[in-house]
Amino acid sequence: MARINPLEKVRNIGIAAHIDAGKTTTTERILFYSGIIHKIGEVHEGTAVTDWMDQERERGITITAAAISTSWKDYQINIIDTPGHVDFTIEVERSMRVLDGVIAVFCSVGGVQPQSETVWRQADRYKVPRIAFINKMDRTGANFYRVHEQMRDRLRANAIAIQLPIGSENDFKGIVDLVRKRAYMYNNDQGTDIEETDIPADLQDQVEEYYTKLVEAVAETDDDLMSKYFDGEPLTEEEIRSALRKGTIAGTIVPVLCGSAFKNKGVQLMLDAVVDYLPAPTEVPPIQGTLPNGDAIERRADDNEPLAALAFKIMADPYGRLTFVRVYSGVLKKGSYVLNATKNKKERISRLVLMKADDRQDVEELRAGDLGAALGLKDTLTGDTITDEGAPVILESLFIPEPVISVAVEPKTKNDMDKLSKALQSLSEEDPTFRVNVDPETNQTVIAGMGELHLEILVDRMLREFKVEANVGAPQVAYRETIRKPVTNVEGKFIRQSGGKGQYGHVVINLEPGEPGTGFEFVSKIVGGVVPKEYIGPAEQGMKESCESGILAGYPLIDVKATLVHGSYHDVDSSEMAFKIAGSMALKEAVLKASPVLLEPMMKVEVEVPEDYIGNVIGDLISRRGQIESQSTEQGLAKVASKVPLATMFGYATDIRSKTQGRGIFTMEFSHYEEVPRSVAETIIAKSKGNA
């Protein structure tokens, strides 16, 4: 089957922003104007096409990244609508991993919010080119120029306006296109009657100022244009457009557009900008991968290269288990056998579908540059690489943050017991930030995630989709343990002689604090075979397993580096099990001597309230052991940035509403782990041992 769209005419884009910037509404308008839907759905009415889970339609927020294929002016556009709530950061993260370009949506009133910064950092991590759409220009308090400056100041983006609004708030009636130097006036509510006119006289000076900035920015992308600019020659529209494209794809320019998706203004011009400035799969660097022998390799966006695809999302579905994939090279065919190179397992593709939110279109194949979903992949999880059997390669996987909050769940009846384990398995396959553990002592099932809303929605899905009734415990903080000082030559010796074959394992280790985020590191410096090679692995495994439960309060031990320096063995009595136990004993003994401490997750909390309430809010954050980092006031609104322990933040959404008469908003995301103050740590440790 031949390719329908040439690769140069494919755009894989995401729509990303902070909550309430209008991402889902923007997506709906794109689908309306590109002919996928014939009636516009609204988020606040619960009818948006991309918000298709019950919870999304009820809450008016986008939880999972819905993938949709559409077209505009002979270009195939694959869109992922991502959530703006920080509890669903993994959805944004995995979308960024598979996209070639992003539309970053900002609210013209709220401007650059904390979550905007998080999304921007994620796009930076994957070097995704982006254009910005300053939305809600019809709202009271809308200010395009303020948000444009915030992008430059807070995001350190080279934000270059390529449009200017004509009017704002209730008087927002059109857009100036700086590249064409033309004005577009909207004459009806549907945004379909657009009149192209000269630029209004009262905007001429402002247009000249921003046009000059645009020309200066594009001239810097090309030596020939720079010479032309310095010689005082005007740049042509085509030269400006071409240089803007070059700068956007290189990540040195972010074109800034404006409009009101809700009022149907500016969306078609934004689609033109997607086609004009965001890259085709052939214009982004080839994907990096690793061969089975460890050598690095690249795969180019080309149908004739061997297959390389990344699974970026798993979803339980009435049709079966859907695996969303981005095909980077080659062709993925229905009915074919493929290799999951990450797990070295052969799998069969039974069906391939293109997504129109919760509607599916069966296809025979997905080609390089395509986003789609496969059915039939039983063992494939998020982050796995799918390849041809004869040309295995492992692509760089996703960055998956650790969960910071957990709750215990218990089935209400015996009948719910089996259903609960199936539901938890299915949900954890879909969402790698959702973890399930069974406490070996209490046999209690504990689920962990990225925040209260995250777990609340997952418990809600267990009831709706899997019909599981469950009791949910109070939220628990994911504490960790670590050490503060290095220790050397700590022994772990396991000897058991009771007639017949005995047991003998003996190791000597050094233990030191590791770099933050490294977890457990192991190095062997054994020389001369004092510990045979076959026993070094088991000794390491024993230490690693020992880290699962720290000595202070049973929380996982992190950021430690163990070095095996010496040991001994017995020709007859030594075994892998004996060295595993000896490794575990050595690590526990070393931790005892290395000043163990308890760590707690610190959250980056940003609060926005009318300035009358700021004193109360700051006092409350300090009472929660918070550290105030910055404070600013703008147009009667005060913003406070702080770091606060997660343990003190449960129920904060309710508290801030009552303290500000419902007018305060906040965002919270994980920042880092920090040592718990001694008095607080003593209480936590006592509680863990049943003494409190």
From Swiss-Prot:
PROSITE patterns to which the protein is assigned, alphabetical? G_TR_1, G_TR_2
Q: Show the GO cellular component annotation of the record.
A: cytoplasm
Q: Name one GO molecular function term.
A: GTPase activity
Q: Recite the UniProt keywords alphabetically.
A: Cytoplasm, Elongation factor, GTP-binding, Nucleotide-binding, Protein biosynthesis
Please indicate which superkingdom the organism of origin belongs to: Bacteria
Binding positions for GTP? 17-24, 81-85, 135-138
- One Pfam family hit: EFG_C
Q: Which residues form the tr-type G domain?
A: 8-282
Q: Where in or outside the cell?
A: Cytoplasm
Q: Mind telling me which InterPro entries this protein's record contains? A: EFG_II, EFG_III, EFG_III/V, EFG_IV, EFG_V, EFG_V-like, EFTu-like_2, G_TR_CS
So where does this one cross the membrane? none
**GO terms for biological process?**
ribosome disassembly
Known role: Catalyzes the GTP-dependent ribosomal translocation step during translation elongation. During this step, the ribosome changes from the pre-translocational (PRE) to the post-translocational (POST) state as the newly formed A-site-bound peptidyl-tRNA and P-site-bound deacylated tRNA move to the P and E sites, respectively. Catalyzes the coordinated movement of the two tRNA molecules, the mRNA and conformational changes in the ribosome.
User: Which family, according to the similarity comment?
Assistant: Belongs to the TRAFAC class translation factor GTPase superfamily. Classic translation factor GTPase family. EF-G/EF-2 subfamily.
Q: Which HAMAP family match?
A: EF_G_EF_2_B
Q: Which PANTHER family match?
A: RIBOSOME-RELEASING FACTOR 2, MITOCHONDRIAL, TRANSLATION ELONGATION FACTOR G-RELATED
Q: What is this protein called?
A: Elongation factor G
Q: Please name the taxonomic classification of the source.
A: Bacteria, Bacillati, Cyanobacteriota, Cyanophyceae, Nostocales
Gene expressing this chain: fusA
